[in-house]
Amino acid sequence: MTKIFKIPPICLGNNNFIHVIEIQTIDQDFGNFINEKIRLITEGSTDTEIPKIKKRLCEFLQRKKGTTIEMGAVAEFMVHLYMNENGFKQEFVFFNLEERSIKKGFDGYYTINDEEWILESKSGTISTSGISHKSKLLEAYSDLEKKVKDSEGNNPWRNAYNHACHRPVESAEDIIKNLKTLAEDFDSGVYKKIENLNLLPATTIFLEGNWNNIDQIALLTDIKTALTTKKFKGINILCIHNKSLELLENFLTT
């Protein structure tokens, strides 16, 4: 299949990267890729018919029309597409297991090459005062710090464990066991330090129909500045320009 996300990652050193992702349209190849991955992303390994899954996702987006939940869901879905294309194993499903909503806790929990990665996705519109990939990166990092320190009153590892235990996710036993340990440690007040975690902060700016490319030189400078005081084991930063919030919903309804 044709590669959908073609811009090569920018190396930050020490096997850390910035991933520049530009979504200007959903053409036939991109649409085929969504159809190929939408079931895995939303439900895991099931036999649900693709049109039914598209309808379910579309109805969710329509219910949340005009809210930050809609924006966040579209941004996250595109992130999951990118991660799947680049070989990361999704250890969760997009939808909350208990209700018709997107999942809680971490925005994603991935594995690749025996390493585990936690995702935090932040998004906004180009018309928002002061918006930038740098500001959204700092916001995502701050939220990850809070989540792993119990600053929000929730156990994100418990949620990740519940998703990994969901049979259609097909998580390996060692992944499930590790998440169970992390969840129990968290409940006991033993928190994982952020410098020992692999982070996937994702920043999406919706361009409201007026396209412009990401300035990679300026982006690299901004990201390096933002990371000066940040701690992590490894980091992959996803910076996304999405032409329109409606691109995905329009595809789902055609």
Enumerate the language-model features and the residues they cover.
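Interdomain/boundary linker segments immediately adjacent to catalytic/signaling cores
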Residues: M1-A73, F77
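Active-site beta-strand-loop-beta-strand hairpin of nuclease catalytic cores
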Residues: Y110-I118
